[in-house]
Each structure stands twice: as structure tokens, then as C-alpha cells.
């Protein structure tokens, strides 16, 4: 079974757990201020991207992963949480797949969903946050971009105040991130990740040698593109890049979803690795 196939198999198992989280029907119904609308009152997602008072593109808003799999019971468990192909395998669509080091290939073959830090209630770190089916609220100021995730009340900080990226930051799940503007694109550099991270449900790795670059651009009101580049010689034979798309979500708010409250699903996940191989 290929890494992509394993990713999709594990995706189905993870989705079963995710469906225990608050569903869309339970999300709040609050109108979002400042949303451009068509004459019939619907959000105009193709309207120009907003700008901040200090002349920068405004990335603020509620976002979630695009490129969602069809709800056919095979590629995706049917439910209200929209699962993307890249959640199962970040290299989906990359010709030839990701350039794994052999130990990563071995891990993908040997490990299962119960080994994924995400299924053990550990908040997904760094770029994996972009692929989650849960909603993320981006809050942008001149000196800081904060990404709030409704899953486990987690957050990520991206410093925009001109500070350099530390040479050897303490390893964390989210790493240490700094950003600067190049025209209408926010360029984010990050490092300082833990060695035991997964980038997707297949088990693609991110280690302490990783240097991650995210080029974030809001192409219109409704679409955010993130060109993600990973240079991690411990896990990959060469650098690689993918594009992650985010869709804006309006007229709602985040709902608290604490993983430990769904720990009744863990016994099923513990039995899943042998079935997923």
C-alpha cells in the first residue's frame, strides 16, 4: 500500500474521530461585519481582498482547508466536517510523491492512526494546522499574526515586528515563526520543530532540522493561498513544495472542541493500526 493509500485509509479512521467534535449545525449564526455581498445578500467571495489601515493585505478572518474530498463514503466519511485530500496526505497531487528518507517510508508503513500525535489530543503543529477540517481564526496586527484553532483551543504566533528567526529555538509543536511582507505576500519563515511531528495522517515527517517557508497571499475576499516549502534534510532527500488553499468562512464563530472530551474513541484508534497497514 502506498503512502497516499495509507493516508486515505487513516483519513477515514481519523474522520470518524473528528465527527465526534461539534458539528456545523451547532455552529453559531452571527453575521460577519465588513463582508462584501451580492445584491441577493450572499457573500461576494470574488470581491477584492481587504487591506489594513497600514497598507498591508488583511489576512484576518475565519478560514478552513479547501480542496475537500467528495462525501462518498470511500474518499471521505460523510458528515459536516469537510476533510481535504492534503489532510490525509500533504503530498497528494505531487508527481512521484514526497521525497522521503527511508526511515520516514518505514514509519509510514509501520505506524497507524493511534501513533499520530493529532489523535492523541496533541495540537497539530505549524503548517499542519492549515489542513485541518476545523475552523481557524486569523487575527492580524502590524506586529503579529495569530492563528486561533478551535481544536483544543490551540494557537500559533507569527511575529511581524522585524525580529530575526532565532538560530536555535527550543523545539515546540508550532516552531518559532517570523514574517515579512513582499508586496501583497506575507513570507513566513519557521524552525524549531520537534522531531516527533506528523504533517498529515499518512505520517509525513517534520523534524528539528526543518526550515519551513509559507508564502501567504489573499487572492480575493474568499480565497487564501499558501505556498508551503519544506527543507528538512533529516526527513527528506530534497526540499519540496505544495500549495494549500484556504476558503473563508463567514457569518459564524468558532466552537470549542476539546479532544480529551472525546477520549472514548481512543480504544477504536488503538485497534486501527493493524487494519490500516
Tell where the protein language model's regions lie, with residue ranges.
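PEST-like low-complexity, intrinsically disordered acidic/proline/serine-rich tracts
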Residues: 21-277
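Bacterial N-terminal signal peptides
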Residues: 10-22
Amino acid at each position: 500500500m502506498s503512502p497516499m493509500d495509507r493516508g486515505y485509509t487513516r483519513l477515514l479512521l481519523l474522520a470518524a474521530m473528528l465527527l465526534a467534535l461539534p458539528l456545523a449545525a451547532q455552529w453559531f449564526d452571527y453575521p460577519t461585519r465588513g463582508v462584501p455581498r451580492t445584491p441577493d445578500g450572499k457573500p461576494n467571495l470574488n470581491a477584492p481582498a481587504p487591506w489594513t489601515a497600514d497598507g498591508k493585505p488583511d489576512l484576518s478572518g475565519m478560514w478552513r482547508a479547501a480542496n475537500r474530498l467528495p462525501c462518498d463514503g470511500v474518499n471521505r466519511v460523510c458528515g459536516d466536517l469537510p476533510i481535504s485530500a492534503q489532510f490525509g496526505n500533504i503530498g497528494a497531487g505531487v508527481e512521484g510523491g514526497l521525497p522521503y528518507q527511508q526511515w520516514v517510508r518505514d514509519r509510514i508503513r509501520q505506524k497507524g492512526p493511534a501513533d499520530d500525535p493529532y489523535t492523541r489530543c496533541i495540537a497539530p503543529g505549524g503548517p499542519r494546522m492549515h489542513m485541518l477540517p476545523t475552523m481557524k481564526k486569523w487575527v492580524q496586527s502590524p506586529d503579529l499574526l495569530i492563528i486561533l484553532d478551535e481544536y483544543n483551543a490551540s494557537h500559533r504566533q507569527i511575529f511581524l515586528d522585524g525580529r530575526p528567526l532565532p538560530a536555535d529555538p527550543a523545539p515546540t509543536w508550532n516552531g518559532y515563526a517570523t514574517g515579512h511582507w513582499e508586496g501583497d505576500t506575507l513570507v513566513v519563515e519557521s524552525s524549531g520543530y520537534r522531531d516527533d511531528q506528523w504533517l498529515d495522517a499518512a505520517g509525513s515527517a517534520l523534524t528539528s532540522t526543518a526550515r519551513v517557508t509559507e508564502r501567504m497571499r489573499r487572492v480575493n475576499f474568499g480565497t487564501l493561498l499558501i505556498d508551503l516549502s519544506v527543507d528538512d534534510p533529516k526527513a527528506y532527500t530534497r526540499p519540496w513544495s505544495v500549495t494549500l488553499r484556504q476558503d473563508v468562512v463567514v457569518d459564524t464563530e468558532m466552537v470549542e472542541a476539546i479532544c480529551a472530551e472525546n477520549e472514548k474513541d481512543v480504544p477504536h484508534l488503538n485497534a486501527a493500526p493493524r487494519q490500516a497497514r
